[in-house]
Structure formats: structure tokens, C-alpha cells
């Protein structure tokens, strides 16, 4: 049985050793928590621990390691195992990171439901599966929620906390505090909705981007520049609502000034794209000019992206609002 918070307040289990699981393990260790990293195959666990060691050493060398502990101290907090009951013993938080498959996740939470007690939080990393489906029928449903990270989690701190309709307020509060403790930026989604908040905003943006390319209003390359050299720069520091507030004499002033224009433009938005066919091929070819789609080029570009995000995160930490 998972022990109570009072006896082992520093125990966390991460179930799944892929990219998201490894990232969670590193984040929890950066906060001083003992972490058990579980996967069904011991070989997977061993490989994940090796990868974590290499990544932590590189982060320390570049001055980007999170937390007050050194890399070796953090690595000493992370252990691996391939026995689920052993992994969750002595923990107060379990972070599920298995592939985004509803049936697979339901099976895992059904197993966990049988071996935990009333003190542990059961948290899923799902990016879009609704808590009401993930946790349906569980005895410990009041202890369940989704804590959706953003890829790559180590460099992008946002975490969406999404409750099941029966999730206890204390579960949300505990998880919110835990995320803050490990340096993440949790947001409370007050009730479940398909796509949560981040993906609803992301898909709205992608949908209009696709329509603009399909209508030959802008090229795929220039479309990306609109975000990377335009909206994205200010959105890295302030959100769309604060942008509105600052771009006039406050929010009410902005709405008075621009509401009719916004409504006029919004009425011209087209139907949901199919994301296939000739337009998909056109966008693919444009992206391949910038980044060929072979593993070597994609991996190098991801590394560059992660390095940029790491430097941006450091800058944001240095630039505090007035």
C-alpha cells in the first residue's frame, strides 16, 4: 500500500520511462523528491536511467540544471524498477506517463486502484483524454486528476491540472502545491473539456494557419514567421488577454475599440480543415526545405529547439515584471 504523506512525504512514482516519464523523474528529483521510475521491461528502465544521467550532466555543464542540488545528488534520488507494487510503495504522488491510449491507461489505473490507499494522488500525463473516461469506476476517484505537461516538460513549465467531476478539492490543491514546489507553472482547469485549455488554443491557431495556407493567402514558411517573429515573441512573456489589456487603456478600452473588427474577422473563419491531401503535401514539402524529415535532421532541430527553450526559460527567470 502507498504510505501516508506524514511518513514518506518525499516519495513519488513515475509510471512509464519514455520522454515524458524521464522528464517528470528529473523534475521531481530537482525538487528533492525520491523518485521510483517504473516500466514493464527492466531493459527500458535501465536505458531511461542512462539517458537521465547523460541529460542531467549536460544540463549541469550548461548551467541549466534545475533545483538547488547537484546532478549527482539528484541522480541519487532516482531509482528504477519493473514491479508496479514496489514502484508505488511509500509514495504520495503517482505520475502516469504511458502511451496516449485510453484502454491502456484505464487498465493501469485499475491496477493502481487496487494497490494504493487513500493518501496517494493518482495523476495522468494525458494531453487530451478526459478524466471522466480515464478514471471511470475507480474506488479512489477523489484522488485522481490529469496533470498535463507541455513538451519538453523540463524546459516548458506549464502543467494543466484537470479534475474528474468527483476529484476532491484537496487533491487539486496538493498537486498544485507539488507542481509549484518543483518549479512548474500549474494552471487549474476548473472543469473538464475536450482538449483542455492548451490544445484548444493550439488547435484553433493551427486550424486558421491551415486555412490561410489552403487559401493561398500566405506561404507555410511565412505563416510560421508570423508566430515565431510576431505573436510568439510577446506571448512568451504575456498572454493574449494581457496583450489586449496593454494594447489599449485597459481591457474595456480594447473591447470598445476593437470588438467590431474582431467579430467581423471571426465571422470569416472557414470550416474545420481535413489536414490531408494536397495542402498537407504542400506544408510537408515546405517544412522539409527547412528541416528534412530524416531522423538525423529532425533530432538536430529538436535539440536546437530545446536549447532555445532552455535559454528562454533562463531569461524569463531573470526578467521579473514590475
Swiss-Prot record:
One of its GO terms (molecular function) is NAD+ binding. One of its GO terms (biological process) is fatty acid metabolic process. It comes from Sus scrofa (Pig). Belongs to the 3-hydroxyacyl-CoA dehydrogenase family. Homodimer. The keyword Ribonucleoprotein does not apply. NAD(+) binds at residues 19-20, 39, 100, 105. Disulfide bonds: none annotated. It holds the Pfam family 3HCDH_N. The modification Phosphoserine is found at residue 6. Gene3D superfamilies: N-(1-d-carboxylethyl)-l-norvaline Dehydrogenase, domain 2, NAD(P)-binding Rossmann-like Domain. It is found in: Cytoplasm. Inhibited by malonate. Its EC number is 1.1.1.45. This is Lambda-crystallin homolog.
Amino acid at each position: 500500500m502507498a504510505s501516508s504523506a506524514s511518513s514518506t512525504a518525499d516519495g513519488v512514482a513515475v509510471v512509464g520511462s519514455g520522454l515524458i516519464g524521464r522528464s517528470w523523474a528529473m523534475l521531481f528529483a530537482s525538487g528533492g523528491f525520491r523518485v521510483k521510475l517504473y516500466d514493464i521491461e527492466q531493459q527500458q528502465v535501465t536505458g531511461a536511467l542512462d539517458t537521465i544521467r547523460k541529460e542531467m550532466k549536460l544540463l549541469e555543464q550548461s548551467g541549466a540544471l534545475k533545483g538547488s542540488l547537484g546532478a549527482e545528488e539528484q541522480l541519487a534520488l532516482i531509482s528504477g524498477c519493473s514491479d508496479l507494487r514496489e514502484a508505488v510503495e511509500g509514495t504520495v504522488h503517482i505520475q502516469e506517463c504511458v502511451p496516449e491510449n485510453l484502454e491502456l491507461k484505464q487498465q493501469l489505473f485499475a491496477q493502481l486502484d487496487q494497490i494504493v490507499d487513500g493518501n496517494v494522488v493518482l495523476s495522468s500525463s494525458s494531453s487530451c483524454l478526459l478524466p471522466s473516461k480515464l478514471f471511470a469506476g475507480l474506488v479512489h476517484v477523489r484522488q485522481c486528476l490529469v496533470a498535463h505537461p507541455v513538451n519538453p516538460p523540463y524546459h516548458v513549465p506549464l502543467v494543466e491540472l484537470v479534475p474528474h467531476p468527483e476529484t476532491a478539492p484537496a487533491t487539486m490543491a496538493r498537486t498544485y502545491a507539488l507542481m509549484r514546489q518543483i518549479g512548474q507553472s500549474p494552471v487549474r482547469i476548473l472543469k473538464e473539456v475536450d482538449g483542455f485549455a492548451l490544445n484548444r488554443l493550439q488547435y484553433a491557431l493551427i486550424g486558421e494557419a491551415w486555412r490561410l495556407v489552403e487559401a493561398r493567402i500566405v506561404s507555410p514558411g511565412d505563416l510560421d514567421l508570423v508566430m515565431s517573429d510576431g505573436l510568439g515573441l510577446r506571448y512568451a512573456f504575456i498572454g493574449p488577454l494581457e496583450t489586449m489589456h496593454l494594447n489599449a487603456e485597459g481591457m474595456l478600452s480594447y473591447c470598445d475599440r476593437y470588438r467590431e473588427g474582431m467579430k467581423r474577422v471571426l465571422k470569416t473563419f472557414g470550416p474545420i480543415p481535413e489536414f490531408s491531401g494536397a495542402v498537407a503535401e504542400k506544408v510537408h514539402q515546405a517544412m522539409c526545405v527547412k528541416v528534412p524529415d530524416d531522423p538525423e535532421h529532425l533530432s538536430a532541430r529538436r535539440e536546437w529547439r530545446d536549447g532555445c527553450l532552455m535559454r528562454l526559460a533562463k531569461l524569463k527567470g531573470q526578467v521579473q515584471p514590475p
